[in-house]
């Protein structure tokens, strides 16, 4: 292993600086598995033993050079000469037979604890005791060590499409993969996706994207000031979003339209995690019926779930909640088929009782936002995203001070949709049932929802502050009820099953 220190980059330092006792900057994934038929009863023990006997390679063997002083100007990654794999690889059990809700309880507790930054900042937990002899793997890692793209590549290389393959190394035996230009050119197909398109990317979008945009809005705007056309497009787009309310622009969501909400408060260190999984074909069929994308349908059922969840808490605002979405769009000046990563705001329709009308409201707002972005060149898109998010700095300051401003907020929560593997994957013959992203929350963002597609399903990972949003599992259940309501209202054969 190399003994050369590697300096942290600006984005990595941002996540490190954001670390606190209540805003932990680790992200993760929860993956339940079904063992193959005839698997030995000690299968999980064998996996754990194999893991602990494995060689660990960089970056998994790296720790901070100055863990006691995170703001050190020469903070670097160095090899941990006292690396203890027993500390990083752990085994625990549910009271058998455990269900998905019971699995969410230990994952919530594990995600509530900060990583020890005196050690390489990652852990993997093998959890047994799920009904039917199933088990789960929960992984968490600090976002300053592994970005989402790299983490996904390593996890994917630990799995196989062949159920009989037992040769794939575990993720911490895999060195950092390279990144080709083609990997960043994922087509959105009209949908909303997280920047790089991977299992863990987008988990830190609310911090990296918004924090970076807010802090750098001046420089970004300055970079296009000399380009007359870009400046004109930017000014026009901001006027359309912030000031115009006529028919053509009434569905555009501006940066001061989000209501004050319980989601936008200070948070504690305690977390609650919940999951849901739906067939993609079901969401696709509903979307086709109403000329909506899969992502629109997903947002609509999240809005329906939040409407009931907040109403039961007595915290449902009269106006609709506003969501921030990372998107990929094709700029008008790009003739090569490339995409630009941007940010839009959209309604969740939480003020609408009818599920079909709610979906229509969501679809209208996302369609208007993406159409506006497509009318701009790449420079204007980046500057527009920065300007749209700039008022979030005031929202965050308001949350931290406890003083509500007289004007609306910028947004209430972040939702990311991350395209994942299309094929069923296996770990030593055990079939991966789902891959749930476990994101992060922050002050003024007590809830984050990250979606990931996998083998014909859409997996929802809900992470929230336990003290702000008690009984978060109910929100996950209510999204399912909202989906059923949409299917029933549709009336098309097969959509209600």
Swiss-Prot record:
One Gene Ontology cellular component: plasma membrane
Gene Ontology MF terms: diacylglycerol O-acyltransferase activity; long-chain-alcohol O-fatty-acyltransferase activity; O-acyltransferase activity
Pathway: Glycerolipid metabolism; triacylglycerol biosynthesis
Top enzyme class: transferase
Entry superkingdom: Bacteria
Pfam families: WS_DGAT_C (PF06974), WS_DGAT_cat (PF03007)
Active site: 143
The UniProt record lists the keyword Lipid biosynthesis: yes
Reaction(s) the record says it catalyses: an acyl-CoA + a 1,2-diacyl-sn-glycerol = a triacyl-sn-glycerol + CoA; di-(9Z)-octadecenoylglycerol + (9Z)-octadecenoyl-CoA = 1,2,3-tri-(9Z-octadecenoyl)-glycerol + CoA; hexadecan-1-ol + hexadecanoyl-CoA = hexadecanyl hexadecanoate + CoA
Entry's EC annotation: 2.3.1.20
Gene Ontology biological process: biological process involved in interaction with host; glycerol metabolic process; glycerolipid biosynthetic process; response to hypoxia; response to nitric oxide; triglyceride biosynthetic process
Family, similarity comment: Belongs to the long-chain O-acyltransferase family.
Summary of the function given for this chain in its UniProt record: Upon expression in E.coli has a weak triacylglycerol synthase function, making triacylglycerol (TG) from diolein and long-chain fatty acyl-CoA. Also functions weakly as a wax synthase, as it incorporates palmityl alcohol into wax esters in the presence of palmitoyl-CoA.
Protein name: Putative diacyglycerol O-acyltransferase Rv3480c
Organism encoding this protein: Mycobacterium tuberculosis (strain ATCC 25618 / H37Rv)
Lineage, uppermost ranks: Bacteria, Bacillati, Actinomycetota, Actinomycetes, Mycobacteriales
């Amino acid at each position: 292993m190399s003994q050369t220190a590697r300096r942290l980059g600006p984005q990595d330092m941002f996540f490190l600086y954001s670390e606190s006792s209540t805003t932990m900057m680790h992200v993760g994934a929860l993956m339940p598995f079904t063992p193959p038929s005839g698997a030995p009863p000690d299968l999980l023990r064998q996996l754990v033993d194999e893991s602990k006997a494995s060689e660990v390679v960089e970056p998994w063997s790296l720790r901070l050079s100055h863990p006691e002083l995170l703001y050190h100007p020469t903070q670097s990654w160095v090899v941990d000469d006292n690396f203890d794999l027993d500390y990083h690889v752990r085994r625990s059990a549910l009271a058998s037979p455990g269900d998905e809700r019971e699995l969410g309880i230990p994952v919530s507790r594990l995600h509530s604890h900060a990583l020890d930054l005196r050690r390489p900042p990652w852990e993997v937990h093998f959890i047994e005791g799920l009904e039917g002899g199933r088990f789960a793997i929960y992984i968490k890692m600090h976002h300053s060590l592994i970005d989402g793209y790299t983490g996904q590549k390593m996890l994917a290389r630990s799995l196989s499409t062949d159920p009989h393959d037992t040769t794939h190394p575990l993720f911490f035996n895999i060195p950092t993969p390279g990144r080709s230009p083609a990997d960043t050119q994922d087509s959105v197909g009209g949908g909303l996706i997280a920047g790089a398109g991977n299992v863990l990317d987008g988990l830190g979008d609310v911090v990296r994207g918004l924090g970076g945009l807010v802090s750098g809005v001046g420089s970004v705007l300055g970079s296009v000031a000399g380009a007359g056309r870009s400046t004109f497009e930017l000014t026009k787009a901001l006027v359309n979003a912030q000031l115009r309310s006529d028919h053509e622009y009434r569905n555009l969501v501006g940066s001061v339209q989000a209501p004050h909400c319980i989601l936008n408060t200070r948070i504690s260190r305690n977390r609650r995690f919940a999951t849901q999984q739906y067939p993609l074909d079901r969401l696709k069929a509903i979307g086709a019926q109403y000329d909506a994308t899969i992502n629109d349908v997903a947002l609509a059922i999240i809005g329906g779930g939040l409407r009931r969840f907040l109403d039961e808490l007595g915290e449902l605002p009269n106006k609709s909640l506003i969501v921030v979405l990372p998107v990929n769009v094709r700029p008008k000046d790009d003739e090569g088929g490339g995409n630009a990563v941007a940010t839009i705001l959209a309604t969740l329709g939480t003020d609408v009782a009818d599920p079909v009308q709610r979906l229509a409201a969501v679809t209208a707002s996302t369609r208007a936002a993406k159409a506006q972005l497509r009318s701009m060149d790449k420079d204007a898109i980046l500057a527009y995203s920065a300007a749209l998010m700039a008022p979030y700095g005031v929202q965050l300051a308001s949350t931290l001070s406890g003083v509500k401003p007289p004007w609306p907020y910028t947004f209430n929560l972040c939702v990311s949709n991350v395209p994942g593997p299309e094929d069923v994957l296996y770990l030593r013959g055990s079939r991966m049932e789902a891959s749930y992203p476990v994101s992060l929350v922050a002050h003024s963002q007590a809830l984050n929802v990250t979606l990931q597609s996998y083998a014909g399903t859409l997996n929802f990972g809900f992470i929230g502050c336990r003290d702000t949003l008690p009984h978060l599992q109910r929100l996950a259940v209510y999204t399912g009820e909202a989906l059923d309501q949409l299917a029933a209202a549709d009336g098309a054969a097969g959509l209600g099953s």
